[in-house]
């Protein structure tokens, strides 16, 4: 996408998938990971990343599986999978605990990761946070015509 390039770009391996990421800012600075929302990619942060880096952070962003330049796996994509992807990214690439800032879906992934791996996440900035009821399983419903009496 034109105008969405920023920072150094590379890939990392998560399970059997290739995942895209980018970063900017000095390596010795505190780490801040930006997570995009549904239908976006790490390029979403093009107008923010350099300013955040100038404020004193090493800024990272990755494309969640199924988005941007990361692999598009077949099958079900869900918050737990994306949280495992973020955990892998924090361990393999960032290499130290980080602040996670997410937009919509990215907020949910950041919060989930903070719950399961508080050793990797210093804090989460959720802007905005989607409705948490989206995590609840939907009740199994059957059409009235398929019910048996």
Predicted features by range, described:
Residues 44-46, 70-76, 135-137:
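Conserved catalytic-core motifs of eukaryotic protein kinase domains, centered on the activation segment
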Residues 49-52, 76-78, 116-119, 126, ...:
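Glycine-rich, phosphate-binding/catalytic loops in enzymes
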